[in-house]
């Protein structure tokens, strides 16, 4: 996605810098702030005077809605871009406490909401249920759009894993073409 010149220019690493004082964490943060579609950065020091930097591209994973904007994030939780329309081929996360800034990790004002989001995603993925959206904006009305045809209403997060296992069995037994709320 980015050229070697872009990466080198933003990294803050200059010719002649001491190989052992270059901070991989600082460099990663600089790169992600300016070039958000970078997922990881690996360093290989080749003595006496070479530092090889390898980056991997971030892929769009999910999309948060905040006001009238959409924020696409990677699977690692880094905000990749801000758009006026949701990205295609990713699921939507509806949250009232997510703080979203391009080039930074998603932050939650409410740690409980973050945990619920992660659990729902984990359990749905474990059951291989296709996610359309997740709504964690109300503690007692958690829900998800799944399989392109169902709205699963979980209520609270009590017994969430069991509820999602039951959801899997229901989606497998309901005939194709039928949709609704579960």
Protein language model regions, located:
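Charged, solvent-exposed interaction patches on well-folded alpha/beta domains
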Residues: 6-18, 25-34, 39-182
